């Protein structure tokens, strides 16, 4: 593992209250508690055109669905196309191919949004030559044969699109977005105004597509001056409105966000005119993590910050909710409910969304100094008689679900894990489904854009499998150990994903499992000691042994800390072994204590360069004598470019028997080897300088367990132990959300005496 960002301790600020526990109750129409659970995750690179490389950037951003709810259509700006997916079976999404915009226009045309109207999908296309020459169109495509039947010029650069319930009007936000690198006169780089001003384009859907008519709703006066309603509302730079997101109410009114202007506009779509304007306001938010310092510490605050809302949705015909992502001046890390009659705030989530991310291990600490979790998407819908709001976090890779039966007082229901950068949130109430499309795609980092489906109706939420209480920030659960004498207590330790090292106590008797304590690793003077701790062993006599991976071979070591977390001793690798390692060294440690003393067993992740190819090492260290004894471990092979096979964890199974995790470095649909093997140690120690290769025995193929979550299959299966209850537990390292979805899988596989026979 390479050097990563640096975590850890949540201090005095309380996490979200009882209403924002990681799971809550939501009653369906018949009073039964219902939850959404994931059914399938589909990487959209699998739906790419023939001839495109598997590594080409392919994304799913905004999506829509046909009237029967069985075909999903999404925008792929990176590929300059739209994609089609068969979701008739929510447990198995199928690709139906794509339609390239190159076939309809220019190579550089980019789709920005889509919506379905009857038998047609309307695709909003950005055709701008530059920021100062914005242009766009909407293509009307017959879904049955994917033929364009009409193209309507929009007169500017479009963003979002929405259709009203009766399919009488379509609204398109014409943003004419700013150039973040341009500096207007008297302003700073990226500031407004940057002309031309944006507006709203309304389509009246009378008759068929050939007779649809467009009507521009201007957001400035004909001479370019600001509308009085905008200045009266106190909007930022009202001479340059930049529409972001549009949404229709059930009764046909249109709500529009002006993100950079920090405003909300209501429009009478039938009359093509503005009916109300109000500011999104400013907020002071306390109890959040505001420093990118590798420490999860929600004691910071942002003061008097504009909300700068992105997505907007109607909770009913009176209230709207906004996801306050922020742009260049603001962002308040939550979502807000506004009363459209008065323009006043009725409810605000405050710090609870960010604290939720911390609680379930999805806090992206690297974004703390910017806009935090960045709530970007928001959608609302009624399922089985219950109204819900769905709020997506772009940076922490989740969607929070709320019961909005009382729209002025939303109640948190659950959190849904997503893949990286959830952009589109699409409720499909007719089929009890929610679809989320995530836009981040980087094949070189193993991060791929995907569409995920969730279905309502489960009695219990499947996520999270582990969470924290008592103000504890956590992540990178790449090590596990049972605590001697405690039937339901495990420990883990954080690695170099954070700037300080914490030993985490886990109560495995609960569902989800609960992290109940964090112990800081320090030196004798009480100063935090940062370690890339990849393995942990809880000693019967108290204290812990840590396996610490070094940036170079000689920096690998076993570290003894006492029960207070104070470092007592360091044991380096033997010089000859260290010389043959690079960055991937110690990965796991376990031990036995008997009449012969304490003996540590440690695994290194990759082969030592002087050893036979395909043979890894397991070492035994006699704490009393300081002697190392080494055994060879035969690794599986891989033919995948850039892949490798290595060891990630070790635990004692019984007298002379060890269990180890062997895994590849692949994730998602490419993951193949996530296994636990056992090895029997010889009764006689090998001769010094030799490396006898042990015979391994398959015990558990963990890959099906990882795939059973129906999400993105995690790469880093790194934690394993036998708990005091006799069960085998495993965990995945979420890499502190660095090139990872951030989801932690924590599972009980079954009884050790059955798995490790």
Predicted regions and their residues:
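Sequence/structural signature of beta-propeller domains
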Residues: 28-757
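Secretory targeting and sorting signals
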Residues: 1-29
